[in-house]
Amino acid sequence: MDEFKQLDLKKREIENRLNELEGVLLKERVTMDTPLLTEDGFPRSDIDVPSIRTARHEIITLRNDHRELEDQIKKVLEKVFSGFSKESLAANDETKLAQEADPLNFNAANYNMNDIISRSKILGRVKPFCVVDSVAVESPAQEAGLCIGDELVHVQNVTSLSELPTFISNNVNKTLDVLLIRGYSADGSTNLVELKLTPHKWQGPGLLGCHLR
């Protein structure tokens, strides 16, 4: 596990540095794609162009390093857990489930959709947890604007497909913030969309009227 700890430490250091660089972009109110030149081809005078360029370059480099570290960490963990028996893994899963928090809180203190969107647009570090592969006509999902192919990133503070059914059942007729990916730009960055979803009974089955996988 020493190797894992070293890799995890490096990963956290990179994430801290990315947050600092993200602050530079947030301060200048720009993203990774905001034009830095005027229509005449001159550097814009309303922003700190040199600082932004430096931050962007370092962000790109660190994002690549971060992905490589995640791959290395995954391989290390696979080696560690490969020695466990199925029985011990099952026991670990049960322990983990028992230690998890109570049903997700609708007003979680650490949840802030605007902050998530701002940070995600700048660094593009969003990871969807499921994909919409069908939407029924006149369903709550269609009312909210969900489309086939949408990749869900957050439903309020839920980021796990296994937790979503219980959360939806506990929040019937409540308006939930949804952050999703709807396609990708030419440079590979995500197109983020924010929707309002209200689970409720309708003429079809379920509370959403869509299928997720």
UniProtKB/Swiss-Prot annotation:
It comes from the Eukaryota. Acts as a chaperone during the assembly of the 26S proteasome, specifically of the base subcomplex of the 19S regulatory complex (RC). Keywords: Chaperone, Coiled coil, Cytoplasm, Nucleus. One of its GO terms (cellular component) is nucleus. Its main location: cytoplasm. This is Probable 26S proteasome regulatory subunit p27. Residues 1-82 form a coiled coil. InterPro entries: Nas2_N, PDZ_sf, PSMD9. The keyword Cytoplasm applies. It is found in: Cytoplasm; Nucleus. GO terms for biological process: proteasome regulatory particle assembly. Residues 120-184 form the PDZ domain. SUPFAM superfamilies: PDZ domain-like.
